Amino acid sequence: MISYIGGKARIGKWIVPYIPNDIETYVEGFSGMFWVYFNMELNDYPNLKTVVYNDFNKLNTNLFKWAKQYDTFWDALSQYPCQQLGVKETPPEYAQMFNEYQKEIFSDNFVITEENSLEVACKYVYVLGQVFSGSKPETASYMDYKGEYRCKVLVFMDKLKNPKYREHFDKITFIENLDFEKVVEKYDSPTTYFYMDPPYWKTENYYSNHDFDSNDHERLANVIKSIQGKFSLSYYDFPQLQQWFPQYEVTIGKNNQLDMFGYSGYTWEKKDFSKAASTKKEKNVGTELLIMNY
């Protein structure tokens, strides 16, 4: 949809082939910009009846509320001027608008209401569309593209008109603003698939309006290990993961000899990738983990 910290825009195509084709309910516990879902070919999931967007950040859930009303959203966004490809001189009022919107929607006492909901969605897109990819939007600075790039707000608006994206918007059944544990309780079933993409270990404070701290990683592990359905979990590796989701069980036989390796039920897949959001080459490579209970 649009650049967002922790988003799976670059890695979503790798994740999708691991999603079972026979699922009836698709749920993301930390949906963000829903990149994995948008990379799915819906025709490949003939039994899919229910799609659940869930995020604890109310700005995200409000954005998706209006993305489902794509014509209205597009019309509203078209009233917000932004940088143009090939136009090197950026009017100073664009940065002023950005700073005003950023200060307003990220203030501690800000409330989204029925009356301001559409306006807030537009202002949020305006801010997300003019910061460095993956930056924390409430503290990031305005980026002047100097005519070298097309504004990401306009790219987002293109998606609102795109038939493929519209098909995906129309398929979204419920938009939730719940803690991950509550959304699991509400939608778990033998035919449910959960994709979990939590704030990564030691990066919890990078996220806007988050309610996920270091102790919540173990809570998440305990919750998803007990579900009826299937899950995929994205992370970078950290020491506790092998304890919570062991790949192998080791049995020691007589004379302290290694007796066997037994498969535990958790599948680990890994992929190296480049992080688009990094400005330092030495920090621009990561290894993405996908842990599954199938």
What would you call each of these model-derived segments?
Residues M1-V36, N43, K281:
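S-adenosyl-L-methionine
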Residues M1-W14, Q69-Y195, P199-N205:
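SAM-dependent nucleic-acid methyltransferase catalytic core
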Residues D22-K103:
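SAM cofactor-binding core of SAM-dependent methyltransferases
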Residues D22-Y26, L48-T50, F169-T173, K225-F231:
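Short active-site oxyanion
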Residues G29-F30, N54-D55, E176-L178, M196-P198, ...:
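Short His-Asn-centered micro-motif
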Residues M33-V36, N57-L59, Q130-S133, F180-V183, ...:
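Short, solvent-exposed loop/turn segments at secondary-structure junctions
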Residues D213-Y294:
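Long, positively charged, glycine-interspersed low-complexity recognition regions
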